[in-house]
């Protein structure tokens, strides 16, 4: 699949409020196709895009850190209260389970956001160099590697932590740990289909982009720093609303 089509589909699959935060790949491609693309205009547009990526990524990352702490507190309270009021425990476990799955999904989407925008920059720079016979790509990508939106280590670590937590908050496991038999009857709540679909699409896109080239280069994406997508999907304890290859 050509990248232009891939990023268009990814934007459509993304959360509505995220859709104007992605790389304006088609606009940049059209600029390159003009009779005499001006480097200063092209670089100015790229820098504006990077500023947009950084602002959005940092804002999301900060929100995730806050949400991470809030969810940890809620889980601690849930474990303390489990069994004292069975009906309340049942509702609380169901609610927090859904919140965790949604939170995990949003973080996966942010990692994918970083990946696909970086890939788009590398590809559009390659097209520019080919069109102008220039050498802009290599020095520009070196700058990109130090941008906040490219540094996904923190978010990837939180993704892995919450994959583990999703198992720990499995109602059956909570019941076994706390010794409350009635809590074991509580089933996991299904997360919203929309966020689940978006997360699945993001995971598959990340795998596809890394599979797209058989050779490693300075412009290749780093290894995927979250669990294999198939394992992530299984860890959700949910039936996928769309087929998973």
Swiss-Prot record:
Induction (UniProt): Up-regulated under phosphate starvation.
A matching Pfam family: SPX
UniProt domain SPX: residue ranges: 1-142
PROSITE patterns in UniProt: SPX
GO BP field: cellular response to phosphate starvation; positive regulation of cellular response to phosphate starvation
Alphabetical list of PANTHER family matching this protein: SPX DOMAIN-CONTAINING PROTEIN 3
Function statement: Plays a positive role in plant adaptation to phosphate starvation and exerts negative feedback regulation of SPX1.
Name the UniProt record assigns to this protein: SPX domain-containing protein 3
Organism: Arabidopsis thaliana (Mouse-ear cress)
Lineage, top ranks: Eukaryota, Viridiplantae, Streptophyta, Embryophyta, Tracheophyta
